[in-house]
Amino acid sequence: MGASFGIALTLVIFAGSDLFTGHTMFMTLGALRRRISLTDLSSSWAMTWLGNLAGAALLAVIFVVGGGGAMLHSKSQFLMTVATAKMNAPAIELFARAILCNWLVCLALWMAARMTNDTAKCVAIFWCLFAFIASGFEHSVANMTLLTIALLGNHPDTVNYAGLAHNLTWVTLGNIVSGALFMGAGYWFASRMPQPDLAPSMEPAE
């Protein structure tokens, strides 16, 4: 799963799509640099989050209507086990795992933005996404799709809409902390620090 999940972020970057978790970093940078207002920041976050939710729900419906493979027909399937764990995890665990997750995702976006070689971009995206999936971290937009698919399948009582709201609330907040504070504000602060002049002096030696 971790080896294949990188295609999602690759499609977002190369197709020029909008991803909420990426906006937490880029829009924060724009606001701190006074390129956009706080109103622009909040409206961008809200519209992107809602747009990602609508897209994730539509994708989940199409996937289920298309049969959904074998993962939707049994309450004991791996998908339902994962959904149950995500929907019933303590808030602090979801929050912490979401911080770590979007830190990796935003690093992938940041590196891709600085690279000109498409192959290098794909490699950077792959390893960052592989790390967050393999570590079991929490990504709000990924969970929108995964948990909606679980709700549309033959799910146990532990998979429900209250659990969906619980997960998305804490995961979204954690994603915002790492994207806006650790990455956006962090790089903004680093760029304002004076840089040492490493160029050799052109003055003649005495």
Question: Residue locations for each model-derived region?
Answer:
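Alpha-helical transmembrane segments and their helix-helix packing motifs
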Residues: 1-206
